[in-house]
């Protein structure tokens, strides 16, 4: 018997697709009909055959995009952009420069930071922006004194629209109104406050205990304490320091003492008043402190010298910047963390204001930048957002209220100094001329070349001549 087998598909038609790796084959039954031809008749037989079928399963997976708050979280601009920043170096501004450089990791953004000594950085800004034309800088670091000088001259861009635009996104209300006021002229906001600062007392608690000294409340107390410790004490470089190592340093110390005596730089007509009785008293008190506590060597003892001397135990006390105080609680920098203590700045007059000024540092955008101000502002804000300032609070005095708990042990002393101190510079462009002329003549008192009266009168005469030429005083 010849048997011919014809296969007919009578069951399911299986559509096969690519399976996911995790899917397992499914067994199904296929019915096949077999036709068998026999002699004289045709017989149809039905046979069930098991085959494997692959099942395709589509699985939807939601993947969370994790944003690292410590990084610069900006979208890449369409075209390559180079941003240049200039400022001056101290620990907290070094930190912010590193935060700015994080935006260098964003595709098409290149960030260059240039940190110089303060006087050098300010001079570079003046030279670059006073000439007109395109600014070589996109981000400029300035402090209170530069607001009146640089923004008042029209060199800086008002940022009101950008502050309003990004107020919620970057929680700019977390920065106190007083800090914004410090960078505002006639309603125009010219910068983002990134640093709070003042000068306050830093001292060795163990040394003061050893000599039976209380924390000084006035500079007369400081002078008395220096007499107890001794200017010629072999254990120390000197008993106490203020900073008179440069012209700009003399001017800052003089400003604090002058205001504490009730004086000021200018009257309502921009005529000088700093050479009057309060000014003479201020210079005389500075010299009295220097002679009693520092000696001639102290006149050249700069900020870095003072900081290191405190850290290695060669200086019992100083009135120093809060921005430097953070290093005093760093065990990697000093073995004296447990005995270094902090107090508000002394007064020059009992029950008068503390001889400590209030400062902020700002990032500003030059008016003639060639890059997109919106992008520049966002780069600044990525460097000064809440997480950045939380980390920065461990290094210096930042501006956001929400991160105060992360700051160092000096913050209470710094805050009390600001609250009870002499305030900020007036935001008058003419004040920049005053500061420059005082920085020129006051050091001559320290060298003995001029008396306090002679130096102040010389500075006043030079100021009047320059301010008149520039139109700040009617001729």
Predicted regions and their residues:
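Hinge/lid segment of periplasmic solute-binding proteins
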Residues: 68-77, 144-198, 214, 223, ...
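A structural signal for short loop-to-beta-strand junctions that line the ligand-binding cleft
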Residues: 127-130, 135-140, 168-207, 351-356, ...
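Extracytoplasmic/periplasmic solute-binding protein
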Residues: 181, 185-194, 199, 223-272, ...
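Extracytoplasmic/periplasmic substrate-recognition and gating elements
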Residues: 130, 211, 284, 289-294, ...
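Extracytoplasmic "Venus flytrap"/periplasmic binding protein-like
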Residues: 99-175, 206-217, 307-309, 313-317, ...
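Short, solvent-exposed loop/beta-turn-alpha elements that line the ligand-binding surface or hinge
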Residues: 75-76, 160-175, 234, 239-244, ...
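Long, aromatic- and glycine/proline-rich binding clefts that accommodate carbohydrate-like moieties
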Residues: 175, 340-347, 392-444, 469-475
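Glycine-centered hinge/linker elements that transmit conformational signals in sensory
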Residues: 225-230, 268-299, 345
């Amino acid at each position: 018997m010849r048997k011919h087998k014809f296969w007919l598909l009578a069951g399911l038609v299986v559509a096969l697709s690519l399976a996911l790796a995790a899917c397992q084959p499914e067994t199904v039954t296929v019915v096949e009909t077999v036709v068998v031809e026999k002699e004289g008749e045709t017989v149809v037989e039905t046979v069930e055959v098991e085959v494997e079928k692959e099942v395709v399963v589509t699985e939807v997976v939601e993947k969370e995009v994790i944003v690292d708050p410590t990084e610069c979280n900006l979208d890449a601009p369409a075209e390559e952009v180079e941003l240049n920043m200039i400022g001056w170096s101290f620990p907290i501004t070094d930190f912010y420069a590193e935060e700015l450089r994080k935006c260098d990791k964003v595709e098409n953004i290149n960030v260059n930071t240039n940190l110089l000594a303060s006087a050098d950085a300010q001079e570079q800004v003046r030279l670059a922006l006073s000439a007109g034309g395109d600014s070589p800088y996109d981000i400029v670091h300035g402090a209170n004194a530069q607001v009146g000088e640089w923004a008042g001259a029209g060199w800086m861009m008002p940022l009101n629209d950008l502050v309003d635009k990004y107020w919620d996104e970057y929680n700019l209300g977390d920065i106190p109104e007083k800090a914004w006021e410090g960078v505002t002229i006639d309603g125009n906001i010219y910068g983002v406050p990134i640093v709070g600062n003042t000068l306050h007392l830093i001292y060795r608690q163990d040394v003061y205990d050893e000599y039976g000294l209380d924390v000084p409340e006035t500079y007369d107390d400081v002078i008395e304490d220096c007499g107890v410790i001794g200017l010629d004490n072999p254990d120390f470089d000197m008993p106490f320091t203020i900073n008179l190592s440069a012209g700009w340093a003399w001017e800052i110390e003089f400003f604090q003492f002058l205001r504490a005596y009730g004086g000021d730089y200018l009257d309502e007509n921009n005529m000088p008043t700093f050479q009057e009785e309060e000014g003479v008293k201020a210079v005389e008190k500075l010299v009295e402190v220097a002679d009693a506590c520092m000696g001639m060597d102290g006149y050249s003892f700069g900020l870095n010298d003072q900081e290191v001397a405190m850290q290695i135990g060669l200086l019992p006390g100083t009135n120093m910047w809060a921005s430097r105080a953070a290093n005093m609680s760093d065990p990697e920098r000093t073995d004296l963390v447990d005995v270094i203590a902090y107090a508000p700045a002394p007064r020059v007059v009992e029950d008068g204001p503390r001889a400590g000024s209030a400062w902020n540092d700002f990032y500003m955008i030059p008016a003639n930048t060639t890059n997109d101000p919106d992008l520049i502002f966002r780069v600044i804000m990525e460097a000064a957002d809440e997480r950045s300032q939380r980390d920065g609070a461990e290094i210096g005095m930042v501006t956001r209220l929400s991160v105060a708990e992360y700051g160092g042990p000096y913050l209470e002393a710094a805050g009390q100094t600001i609250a009870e101190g002499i305030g900020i510079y007036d935001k008058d462009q003419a004040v920049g001329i005053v500061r420059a002329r005082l920085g020129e003549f006051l050091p001559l008192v320290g060298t003995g070349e001029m008396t306090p009266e002679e130096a102040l009168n010389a500075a006043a005469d030079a100021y009047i001549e320059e301010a008149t030429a520039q139109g700040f005083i009617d001729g």
